[in-house]
Amino acid sequence: MASARQALLDALEAHPPADDDERRDRAAIIALVAAGPHCFDRDFYTPGHVTGSAFVVDRDSGRVLLHHHRRLDRWLQLGGHDDGEHDPLRTALREAREESGLTDLVPLTRRILDVDVHRIPPAGGEPAHEHHDVRYALVTATPDAIVRADESHDLRWFTLEEAARRMAEPGADRALRRLAALTDWHAG
């Protein structure tokens, strides 16, 4: 097995699921990655492909950065498709930099924050498929340097509680709870 896939499998095996939903999603991602290198191919739709995303945190305030995704019309963490990295953390870093304009992003930890498998509706010639999302926590010291990318309606900082309300989905709530536990910050 290629070393990138093996490294991801090792990281997934080391990641403790918080609940039955995450346990199921982790198993699905492990099965996809173990099945072959197509797991990183954004054109692999059955069932889907690995993506990398990031919950970006302001080092000083503990606020989290979300963008209002133009196509999906929802508040989401930053992230997206593998562009040849074959490493969801590197994908998350690249996507977060592209989508926020923040150049100083660094991982809070190299460990996985959360995993989630979610359905993407058909659009732009792509069929409905699943994103097997591997999520990380990134930190910035320059929160005022954000620049909204074209794929976003809005880009904004929220407390962890506000972010949970805006995202309004169990996987995000779980990731935000983990983020709070990893940091000394208290949303307010």
Identify the meaning behind each predicted range.
Residues 41-77:
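N-terminal strand-loop-strand
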Residues 83-174:
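Unchanged
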Residues 1-28, 100:
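Predominantly extracellular/luminal regions of secreted and cell-surface proteins
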Residues 173-188:
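Charged phosphate-binding loop/patch that engages nucleotide di/tri-phosphates or the phosphate backbone
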Residues 16-53:
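Acidic, metal-coordinating catalytic segment for phosphate/diphosphate chemistry
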Residues 23-26, 136, 188:
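Short glycine-rich, low-complexity/disordered patches
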